Amino acid sequence: MDKKNGGFDLESEIRRLDVSKEFKIEDNLKKKVVKVVAKKDSASSVTKSADLSGVKDSNGVIFSDFDYDIPSSGLENNIKTLEQSNIIKFFNGKDYVEIEKLYDKPITEVRKIVEGLGTNHTIAVTMKKTELIFLLVKILSENNIDVLFTGVLDVLSDGYGFLRTASNSYLSGGNDVYVSPSQIRLFNLRTGDILYGQIRSPRDGERFFAMVKIKSINDQDPTFAQNRIPFDNLTPLYPNVKLNLEYENCNISTRLINLFSPIGKGQRALIVSPPKAGKTTLLQKIANAITTNYSDVILMILLIDERPEEVTDMIRSVKGEVIASNFDEQASRHVQVAEMVIEKAKRLVENKKDVVILLDSITRLARAYNQTMPTSGKILSGGVDSNALHKPKRFFGSARNIEEGGSLTIIATALVDTGSKMDEVIFEEFKSTGNMELILDRSLADRRLFPAINIKKSGTRKEELLLSEEERSKILLIRRILGGVDDYEGVEVLIEKMKKSKNNEIFLKTMSNGN
């Protein structure tokens, strides 16, 4: 019994793992022996061996068949070079490396690191990034260097779990880390928990890295997770703290939202948009405003059924975490990504964090659930199963302000005027579930008036909790003026006047003076 690792026998837990339940393993696997020469002292070197299998699963090759020697000469100097380049760090008398940061590096850089430790170039160029990192962990472990890993826990029905990474959109892959049932029970772990701890490379007959020591859970001491209140038992309140989207030299879009559809912490906001009305650009503006004004708010952008080029553009345009499932992926993949994101957000809120999820779009997520849910035999108009909208509603309904501390804000886009009866039914189901609506107008976008926001139809429930009495009275006056004019003319004049003022405070003062 290993008392240092929480009173459980890690080795027996690993061996109990039936990996065939998670992956389809091909028959006739060939095993090769990798000879790793690790320098143990200045006088001699010892040759060690371990088995790596040419295993394939539904996600591709995990480990290739290869056989080579790593020379002990120069290994110690190359490790010192990694220390100088800040890849290997030193803390509390011990060398360590945070392995998940290697996944963010280009494969060429990872290959260069592995080659620097003695791997032949002709072999390294044939290996995938996962294989290179696997080998690197093995070499570093042999040289008494701790390997640390951060990932989001996905607990499976059999009681054990795996740590998924954001670089793989929290989906299963060869870089996952096994977490034993004993660890999950000991620390009361749930899907979505962010674990940080020491891992080791697979041993004989194993296929995954394994967590051997948990150092933190959701950036807090592991013991905190044992006594936390579950998300569903927390007390929801109306949003009462405004998320200010205005900053110096900001876009008119966020200034308009700040006045006519204010967003609070815990808001359940719906951006209703026809095609080509600028919803993606608007989401980028909102994301940049949040990251600029609130460094403590955790921002996640979830893109479902999206075009790959738009995913790249979003990653490069905003500072938050972007999780995406492209339109060429299966519907089940869309669902899995979305569920991992919402579970991660819930765990953070349980730790009194303020989280914002920007979802594009709730319509596509509902379509994915409609394809993956077992049929109930009750089909609504448009081909929507009556049970299919339950889970996307639970996703959207998770947004709330928490009395005990923390909040989950969800700003989701809903597609309309697409020509699809299904999209129309989905929008009607979600129309009354939010507490803030921002309506984008296709007629304004066609006339190249951006932001194409229909001020008359947009608004926030309980906006008196987010705006001062003075602001409300002046905004009410503007709404009355806009109510008597054409939509295009009213928005055009409003935008022109706002552009002449530096910020909303100055703009409201000019309006009160009759200008």
Curated annotation (Swiss-Prot):
InterPro entries: AAA+_ATPase, ATPase_F1/V1/A1_a/bsu_nucl-bd, CSD, NA-bd_OB-fold, P-loop_NTPase, Rho_factor_ATP-bd, Rho_RNA-bd, Term_rho. SMART domains: AAA (SM00382), CSP (SM00357). GO terms for biological process: DNA-templated transcription termination. ATP binds at G264, K265, G266, Q267, R268, A269, K276, A277, G278, K279, T280, T281, R307. It comes from the Bacteria. The keyword Transcription applies. Residues 146-221 form the Rho RNA-BD domain. GO terms for molecular function: ATP binding; ATP hydrolysis activity; ATP-dependent activity, acting on RNA; helicase activity; RNA binding. Its EC number is 3.6.4.-. It is an enzyme of class 3 (hydrolase). Keywords: ATP-binding, Helicase, Hydrolase, Nucleotide-binding, RNA-binding, Transcription, Transcription regulation, Transcription termination. PROSITE patterns: RHO_RNA_BD. Facilitates transcription termination by a mechanism that involves Rho binding to the nascent RNA, activation of Rho's RNA-dependent ATPase activity, and release of the mRNA from the DNA template. Belongs to the Rho family. Homohexamer. The homohexamer assembles into an open ring structure. This is Transcription termination factor Rho. The gene is rho.
